[in-house]
Amino acid sequence: MTIYNFSAGPAVLPKPVLERAQAEFLDYNGSGMSVLEMSHRSKDFDDIIKGAEATLRELMAIPDNYKVIFLQGGASLEFTMIPLNFAQGKKAYYLVGGSWGKKAYTEAVKLSKTIAFEPILLGSTEDITYAELPTFDKNDIDPTAAYVHLTTNNTIEGTAVYDIPDTNGVPVIADMSSNILAARYNVEDFAMIYAGAQKNIGPAGVTVVIVREDFLNDQPMLSSMLDYRIQAENDSLYNTPPAYSIYISKLVFEWVKEIGGVDEMEKINREKSGLLYDYIDQSNFYTNPVRKKEERSVANIPFVSPSEELDAKFVKEATAAGFKNIKGHRSVGGMRASLYNAFPRQGVVELIEFMKKFAVENA
């Protein structure tokens, strides 16, 4: 039985990447050592981290005036680091279109109790369970504000921001954790992009930060570890980095390049997700909660059956049939198919066949 992993993260990795990592596991590049036990100051690891950065720059067309940093702590740590580095004494706006955006805003509010800045909720659709993206009037934004924070893909709710809104000249910071390298964005539209690795980049343990140099803080932070400038000046080596996660990420970047780059990857993802959306749309058994088709995520597709009881039955039977981790997030229920870059098209085709069979048997 073929296993298809629909996990929202940590998520499926490309099989060629896993096979290469397996082949190099005990002896990387003739060194006689695994990357797991290699010094982060060695030439071999220097080649790995520089190669990872160079390939990512090529894939995303990252300009020279942006720094690429590999950090620890997950994207959730950035919820604290961002206001700590950039917002002191200023306003900071948050556009909340999903659960992770709300967490970023909540952390900012917490921090504002001890650090002087003003977090402002620019827009939220929590009252309609994030079934669509929030809107706002750009004239409501103070042009002297530190930044506008948004999430480009809402992993739990299945919506995505493809066109970056006008923010009245205020720098945009984006959490791109779940659709980085899956859809094309112009890096220059952002002052900073960050992404946890465990969806489209690699294994958990590393977070990629892409930040414009002139946006970096010029005041010392409370902690060197939480200071973007120090991390950037030390080329991600201020302390021991998550070396193996960076190595796997490098292999994933090379795999995306071999596929044809981000533009080709987006084309594949739209075709792949389109198969499932088209079936759900014509079905009278399943529904997708996203109200506007143009806001649908290509990475995360939530859906429900006619009842919670049938949802539970679907998850149980799907799991037994090899469709793993398809249960929806605990906060929303139902089912969720996470179709990240490495997820195979055949898995979508077979899922649809299972969905058809289940619908007939339970109509």
Swiss-Prot record:
GO CC terms, sorted: cytoplasm
Lineage top rank: taxon: Bacteria
Amino-acid positions noted as binding pyridoxal 5'-phosphate in the UniProt annotation, renumbered to this chain: A75, S76, W100, T155, D175, Q198, N239, T240
Essential cofactor(s): pyridoxal 5'-phosphate
Annotated pathway: Amino-acid biosynthesis; L-serine biosynthesis; L-serine from 3-phospho-D-glycerate: step 2/3
Cofactor comment text: Binds 1 pyridoxal phosphate per subunit.
GO biological process: L-serine biosynthetic process
Alphabetical UniProt keywords: Amino-acid biosynthesis, Aminotransferase, Cytoplasm, Pyridoxal phosphate, Serine biosynthesis, Transferase
Catalytic reaction list: O-phospho-L-serine + 2-oxoglutarate = 3-phosphooxypyruvate + L-glutamate; 4-(phosphooxy)-L-threonine + 2-oxoglutarate = (R)-3-hydroxy-2-oxo-4-phosphooxybutanoate + L-glutamate
MF terms in GO: O-phospho-L-serine:2-oxoglutarate aminotransferase activity; pyridoxal phosphate binding
Residues that bear N6-(pyridoxal phosphate)lysine: K199
InterPro entries, per database record: Aminotrans_V_dom, Pser_aminoTfrase, PyrdxlP-dep_Trfase, PyrdxlP-dep_Trfase_major, PyrdxlP-dep_Trfase_small
Binding site residues for L-glutamate: R41
Enzyme superclass (EC): transferase
Subcellular location, record wording: Cytoplasm
EC number: 2.6.1.52
Subunit details: Homodimer.
Protein task: Catalyzes the reversible conversion of 3-phosphohydroxypyruvate to phosphoserine and of 3-hydroxy-2-oxo-4-phosphonooxybutanoate to phosphohydroxythreonine.
The family this protein is said to belong to: Belongs to the class-V pyridoxal-phosphate-dependent aminotransferase family. SerC subfamily.
UniProt cross-references to NCBIfam families, sorted A to Z: PRK05355.1, serC_1
Listed name of the protein: Phosphoserine aminotransferase
Native source species: Streptococcus suis (strain 05ZYH33)
